[in-house]
């Protein structure tokens, strides 16, 4: 029984299946962890969702910002952009089933035995684990409810960007969503910076990657995350695993086998893919 952690798939279905074949992933025996952003940019978002859903209890995933954006497009709140290549999914006969399943997925995964935590963007250093769990449940409860379109309409925005237990209402939910799905850099006090997307070496002072600021979760748990392709899986402290290696931008899809910390890599097919949404970062 092995545990495989894979970074952002972004609709790269062929690469996902090739990587799982490479590691001899066996559903029912092994467990697959996915860092979120299952969809958008790559050509196979529909196939990715169908496959991941079919795995049942053999998969543990978290929602990413592109997954949430897909839900907003599906409900008519956001525009379907051609570069995201979501039209086959949105027009599929099982779209309702797939997206209602997707919105009921978590923002946070925790394995106490392995001392492993996973979130799409990471864990803000302003939170301890009980706070992170409570915050994840707050957003998950809204997404699972009939009022989820109201939340999706209000989730866009960069403020508030500083955690306080006193945050309430939509501001609280927006901060939680940004921390779990969009965070990269923080100010030294842990306050989120929602604008910088470059590599850590190019970031303006005093910004630091969230994982470079000491926080209570990282003291006791390993943290796996995706979202930040420009890291190229490098430059994180011991126990912090950056798994997004930019498959949808022509990089690769990366898998970490947890038990022996061995990495497996599947190169992107995007150099073969010159259609709408080709591998050019925006």
UniProtKB/Swiss-Prot annotation:
Keywords: Hydrolase. The keyword Hydrolase applies. Its EC number is 3.6.1.41. InterPro entries: ApaH, Calcineurin-like_PHP_ApaH, Metallo-depent_PP-like. Coiled coil: none annotated. It is an enzyme of class 3 (hydrolase). It catalyses: P(1),P(4)-bis(5'-adenosyl) tetraphosphate + H2O = 2 ADP + 2 H(+). It holds the Pfam family Metallophos. GO terms for molecular function: bis(5'-nucleosyl)-tetraphosphatase (symmetrical) activity. CDD domains: MPP_ApaH. The keyword Hydrolase applies. Hydrolyzes diadenosine 5',5'''-P1,P4-tetraphosphate to yield ADP. Belongs to the Ap4A hydrolase family. This is Bis(5'-nucleosyl)-tetraphosphatase, symmetrical. It comes from Shigella dysenteriae serotype 1 (strain Sd197).
